[in-house]
Regions:
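Active-site catalytic microenvironments for nucleophilic, acid-base chemistry
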Residues: 127-131, 180-187
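Short, conserved alpha-helical segments within structured domains
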Residues: 116-120, 143, 170-173
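Conserved non-catalytic scaffold segment of RNase H-like nuclease domains
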Residues: 3-129, 133, 138, 156, ...
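Phosphate-binding/catalytic loops
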Residues: 149-171
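Conserved beta-strand -> loop -> alpha-helix junction used to position metal-binding or nucleic-acid-contacting
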Residues: 134-152
């Protein structure tokens, strides 16, 4: 799988130049209609099924916020989200039912940003394949941007992952990631 890193590393850039490139990217990402920030919750880290997805714009407009029926029982041992019950997820739409909405909010040339874009990308593509659906432009790794990588670059530690504080929902994750993006752009 392609590694989703932004800005791309340049060996001939100093740490200060790399930081400023990251600040410029964050400022562009916060322009109206430039970026949709995606937040996801899964049943397990890395390989879990999608159970919640949200998407917001830089002005905090909520474009998507829904639970997702994983169509499989949640293993109580790996349950990460005690506030979500089987009954809540059973009545939620499936990924196949929300894919069109996700495609719509991320279309028209916008960048797709997620805190951990590599994980978000893998989850969205994996869910699309499991549903037998075409992820269209979501399958292009060049459209995705990692706010975590931008944060690491900005802090001068491009090889270190700084996690977000725990959040209660995919929407909360979007807002936390947006806050990081705003911090970077304010530099």
């Amino acid at each position: 799988m392609t590694t989703l890193v932004y800005p791309p590393p340049h060996e001939n850039m100093t740490a200060g130049e790399h930081r400023q490139a990251t600040v410029r990217w964050a400022r562009r990402a916060l322009r109206p209609d430039a970026t949709v920030i995606i937040g996801l919750e899964t049943t397990a880290p890395g390989s879990g099924s999608l159970i919640e997805i949200a998407g917001i714009e830089a002005d905090r407009t909520i474009r998507l916020n829904t639970l997702v029926n994983p169509k499989t029982p949640i293993n109580p041992v790996t349950r990460r989200h005690p506030h979500l019950t089987e009954d809540m997820l059973t009545g939620a739409p499936t990924f196949g039912q929300i894919l069109t909405e996700l495609l719509t909010i991320t279309d028209d040339g916008r960048s797709i940003a997620a805190y951990n874009s590599g994980s978000a990308f893998a989850t969205v593509i994996g869910e699309s394949r499991r549903a037998g659906l075409d992820p269209e432009h979501l399958e292009d790794p060049a459209a995705w941007r990692s706010i975590a990588q931008a944060r690491s670059n900005w802090l001068g530690h491009p090889d270190h992952y700084f996690p977000l504080p725990p959040t209660a929902s995919a929407l909360d994750q979007c807002h936390a990631a947006l806050s990081v993006l705003r911090d970077i752009s304010a530099d």
